[in-house]
UniProtKB/Swiss-Prot annotation:
Family annotation (PANTHER family): CHORISMATE SYNTHASE (PTHR21085:SF0)
Binding residues annotated for FMN, in chain numbering: R124, S125, S126, G286, K301, P302, T303, A304, T305, R327
Enzyme class: lyase
UniProt xrefs under Gene3D superfamilies: Chorismate synthase AroC
Species this protein is from: Nostoc punctiforme (strain ATCC 29133 / PCC 73102)
One cellular component (GO) term of this entry: cytosol
PROSITE patterns referenced in this protein's UniProt entry, alphabetically: CHORISMATE_SYNTHASE_1, CHORISMATE_SYNTHASE_2, CHORISMATE_SYNTHASE_3
UniProt subunit comment: Homotetramer.
Protein name: Chorismate synthase
Amino acid sequence: MGNIFGHLFRISTFGESHGGGVGVVIDGCPPQLEISAEEIQVELDRRRPGQSKITTPRKEADTCEIISGVFEGKTLGTPITILVRNQDTRPQDYDEMAQKYRPSHADATYDAKYGIRNWQGGGRSSARETIGRVAAGAIAKKILRQVANVEIIAYVKRIKDLEGVVDPNTVTLEQVESNIVRCPDAECGDRMIELIEQIGRQGDSIGGVVECVARNVPKGLGEPVFDKLEADIAKGVMSLPASKGFEIGSGFAGTLLTGIEHNDEFYIDQNDEIRTVTNRSGGIQGGISNGENIILRVAFKPTATIRKEQKTVTREGEETLLAAKGRHDPCVLPRAVPMVEAMVALVLCDHLLRHHGQCKVL
């Protein structure tokens, strides 16, 4: 249960961290979309482990295989299956964790729910599960670009107490990818890299905030009440491993303002379009996109699996100590950037198809 996401553009991910492989089945993709494994690989390469000195040293090529749903370079309208085979597995690193629970990880809760768990790398609770999301997100991004010229860019906004100065309205992908931490503020990015390296040498971890902007989103996406656009985006990004907080537009800072300070006043632009002077709503009003940039932020906690010794308990209920082995990110933020983009793309693509199906028929 809980392995399916979306309504019309639906995905189901599969696989475990140290099993044979991971992947995704995509249902509801429109036919005749030109797509290649190479295009999907670009996004997977941004997510893959071992890409820099501040990520996990696990070495995986994460080469994707399109198993079904694409013929002669075009989607068929049938389910698309994408598989990435695991190569650099070391299940023996987790032998101790077969009995000892990692603090703040899913080990104890999976056992409490199912009475059994894959303790080799966390199984489905591993961030390796997100490979399927990023692969599907690559296809969703292409649909959004082709239909509405939608552009989705995420970046590292903050690591611990180091916060970059970035304008989400003008930031470019080239700026994001200009350094290994994926912070467009180059000077702050250098300090972030130094901090992550320092924390990693100590066997510890740190968290931070990813900010994301979606530009050129058509007006009208989102459904009233329970399927509001920001609610579905929140569900998508909050389902990512290690995510602990979400805000959109002014977010929690908006609670410090009065109504006259917070309201986005309307005006008519040179193209006779209704626009807003400010964008504290973050591009969504009443759960429906208003045509302004959608701007959101996701908080990620420090990686739970660390080499520092911690108090814990065993499956048998005995108190003990654990200094975790294995290969893990000292900070998940640089690799979380394409994950956030993927989830936002999946939600927007799903709502685009739903909107066209309901409101563009007659």
